[in-house]
Amino acid sequence: MKTALVTGSGGLIGSQSVIKLVEAGWHVVGVENDMRASFFGPEASTRPVSDRLASTLDEFEPVELDIRDAEGVNRVFADRKVELVVHTAAQPSHDWAARDPQTDFGVNAIGTLNLLEAARNHAPDAPFIFCSTNKVYGDTPNFLPLIETDTRLELPEDHEYFDGIDTGMSIDHSTHSLFGVSKASADLLVQEYGRYFEMPTVCFRGGCLTGPQHAGAELHGFLAYLMKCVVTGRPYTVFGYDGKQVRDNIH
């Protein structure tokens, strides 16, 4: 049986990856340490999802590990024949990153470097899938020729990005936020390991992801958090741009 390693296995994308891989016949090693609870509080904890995966999936092997621990990460790879890496673990919030830039960079950039090095040393042929973010583009999209209507900001229908921004957009010369910088650093590392060491790496620059396992909190996971506010009657605040910003959600 093939072995896949999924980091952030209790999170939204990580947990769905675990389920799909197990269904496809893989043995899945899930790396998780519930840092989301320390970032955003107990309502954002991934522990319930991790416990549910462990109790319902026979081929799921949970490993409690902080990806900033280079020796621990290396040991996980050295002790197993890993044939696929799905790296979703991250500190995912702009605001939180500004509170503690060192932790943000440590998790997002150094943690990714630790995984890449371990993969290079022990599983160089394993596809390495990295969940990057559209925040690597910084505020460049704000300088597009946006049209302000009564309810939203929109691009002209004949604009090349009307149906979405592709990876051709530059990530340079923009304000990224500290979170965007740490994720852009990781994104570039994943690309460079692919090119320089000829490893099969890929970056997915998603944004506004949601789904049934999302532990939404005010600082991250806005759609899940919005639904939570609707159900509980809690006020929901939209910040900036007069509430006219437009986001495409990926389920």
Where are these regions (language model features)?
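A conserved pocket-lining segment of Rossmann-fold NAD(P)-dependent short-chain dehydrogenase/reductase
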Residues: A97, D163-S177, T201-A215, L226-I250
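A glycine/serine/threonine-rich, flexible loop-to-helix segment
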Residues: P42, F143-P145, G216-Y225
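N-terminal Rossmann-like NAD(P)+-binding domain of SDR-like oxidoreductases, especially those catalyzing
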Residues: M1-G207
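A conserved catalytic-core signature of glycosyltransferases
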Residues: C131, G221, Q245
